[in-house]
Amino acid sequence: VISVNDMRESHFRIGTVGKVIDGVTVKIAEDGEILCKGPNVMMGYYKEEEKTKEVMSGDYFHTGDIGEIDADGFLKITDRKKEMFKTSGGKYIAPQVIENQMKQSLFIEQIMVVGAGRKMPAALIQPNVEYVINWLKEEGVSCTSLAAAVKETKLIEAFQNEIDTHNQHFGSWEQIKKFQLTPEEWTIDEGHLTPTMKLKRKVIKDKYDGLIESMYA
């Protein structure tokens, strides 16, 4: 345990994991990873020097989580380091942060940010089927399937407006410049999602490799 949300003395903030407990020191590495040291942190793995070097920098333990500490001292976890990637320009991208922001749009059911080693991040998007079909109907366009809906120019323009709106929360290097709408829903049964509804990133990347390449063509 390195931090606690405590109801006493207003030491509680929704969306964070609380304030760092006494005796523990937390710092944020250059790539955004949360590092900590204190009496609750191990010295290393028993007789596993190489394994220890992977997770320890001096007295600091690498948590594997990406996060930030706000002005009031509350610690917030925003992503997992293993899901972060670097663009060809050397900028680190935390995809989950961008995805969570974009999913505030009623148009978006699922989204996966890609772009490792590329000049910019881009996104694969699974639209909210019921919402977009109803939206198109109100716009005078009749569609009965997602596959048909994603080809409609009006819908693509609406998604561009949504992306542009939510891009304002990010730096220029993090903004989604290109996106593709997938013609089917992402489901557990089809292998897109885990039983807890998390993205199976490799599966999705492999399945839509053609769409990804088209965004960087």
Residues of each region from the PLM?
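Conserved C-terminal "lid"/linker of ANL adenylate-forming enzymes
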Residues: 85, 110-112, 135, 160-217
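Alpha-helical "lid/cap" subdomains adjacent to substrate-binding clefts that gate access
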Residues: 127-166, 183
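C-terminal boundary motif of the adenylate-forming
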Residues: 66, 71, 105-131
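Conserved ATP-binding/catalytic segment of the ANL
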Residues: 20-87
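Conserved ANL (AMP-binding/adenylate-forming) active-site segment centered on the GW(Y/F)…HTG consensus within
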Residues: 10-17, 41-64, 98-99, 140-150
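Short Gly/Ser/Thr- and Asp/Glu-enriched loop/turn motifs at secondary-structure junctions
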Residues: 80, 116-120, 174-176
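Adenylate-forming
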Residues: 1-6
